[in-house]
């Protein structure tokens, strides 16, 4: 459990991201797009996945031998949305985390984030791969707000599935 000082810092990070909205503003040229709506509260987001060729030396683009996997690299997630501070902060934190990852690595982060959101405040063993998005762990205590935090992550998961299925 976080100390009161740490909890205050986490809350400030969430508020800052809900105002700054990193990655906000849809950018043309994405390879996949997903629109998600939380009918319970009206939060909504449209998210675009932007990839670049994975033959370079981007973060995470190497296999166990140090060679390139050839998997594309996420250049950015661009998004537009409206909703509560939690959903907007979560989208901002996700768009900060994703660049440099492969779609496979993003899928792993989404699964870890989902596990954290289902933990009801218990967290996950290792939240380091989530970067600053780990501050949203406190939201998992409030079941009604988990959908708010998950909205952008579900949209990102959908875009990765579109690319993987060859629909993009």
Please name every model-derived segment.
Residues 20-55, 74-81:
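Structured beta-strand/loop patches that form or line metal/cofactor-binding pockets in enzymes
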């Amino acid at each position: 459990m976080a100390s009161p000082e740490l909890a205050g810092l986490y809350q400030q990070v969430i508020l800052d991201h809900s105002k700054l909205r990193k990655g906000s503003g849809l950018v043309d040229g994405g390879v996949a797009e997903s629109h998600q709506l939380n009918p319970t509260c009206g939060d909504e987001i449209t998210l675009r996945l932007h990839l670049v060729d994975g033959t370079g030396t981007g973060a995470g683009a190497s296999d166990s031998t140090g060679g390139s996997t050839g998997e594309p690299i996420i250049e950015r997630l661009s998004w537009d949305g409206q909703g509560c501070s939690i959903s907007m902060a979560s989208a901002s934190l996700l768009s900060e985390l994703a660049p440099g990852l492969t779609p496979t690595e993003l899928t792993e982060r989404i699964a870890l984030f989902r596990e954290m959101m289902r933990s009801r405040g218990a967290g996950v063993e290792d939240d380091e791969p989530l970067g600053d998005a780990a501050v949203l762990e406190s939201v998992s205590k409030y079941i009604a707000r988990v959908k708010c935090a998950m909205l952008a992550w579900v949209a990102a998961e959908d875009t990765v599935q579109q690319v993987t299925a060859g629909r993009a």
